[in-house]
Amino acid sequence: MFSRYTDGRGLRRYLAGAAAARAGDEMSGPALLLLGFAVTGRPGTGSGLLASLTVAGAAGGPWFGALLDRSRRPDRLLARTLVAYALGIVAVQAAVGRLPMPALAAIALLAGLFNPAVTGGWTAQLPRVVTGRELDRGSALDALTFSAASLAGPALAAGVAAGVGARAAVLTAAALVTLAVPSACSLSRY
């Protein structure tokens, strides 16, 4: 049985949000890598942006997990953190070519601190959506969103960058993360 809804709307909404956020996340790193190189002509810029975003995400996990566990409304915290992550990605995009690399790395580090909302923060909400035997099925489907995003995100980044430019690829990644916000906000209904 699905949580409080017998038709599975909660799980479908959860999975749609997870897929969008994770595709945007998996797209953001390669898009920033491509942007750094496209704008500066130096491969080190792109790889530095990717490294900064990634390292901060790993460091931010325990911090975000503790906040989420203590939150009275984890759905709202998750939604706000998704918005902050998307805005951080956009800020990096806007600063590339305008600021020196140390400043770019600092912005990417700050943005990356919000990355755990897309991964563990989202998955931690699954028991709010499904319970009992459906939790196993929901967990398997949730895991599939990681796999699908890890395949689609980089390909989408390359396709958008080749078609419209690297800046557009970064903005598309941020838009995908933002598309997940309504799903995150709706988690309190289940």
Predicted regions and their residues:
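Helix-loop boundary and gating motifs at the non-cytosolic
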Residues: M1-A58
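Hydrophobic core of transmembrane alpha-helices in multi-pass small-molecule transporters
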Residues: A19, G88, P100-A117
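Transmembrane alpha-helix termini and helix-breaking/packing motifs in multi-pass membrane transporters
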Residues: P30-V39, A95, A152-A173
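Helix-to-loop junctions at the C-terminal end of transmembrane segments
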Residues: A59-R73, A161
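Cytoplasmic membrane-interface "Motif A"-like loop-to-helix N-cap segments
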Residues: R70-V83
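C-terminal ends and interior cores of transmembrane alpha-helices
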Residues: V83-R98
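Cytoplasmic helix-loop-helix junction between adjacent transmembrane helices
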Residues: I107-A148
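Helix-loop junctions on the cytosolic side of multi-pass membrane transporters
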Residues: R128-V129, A175-Y190
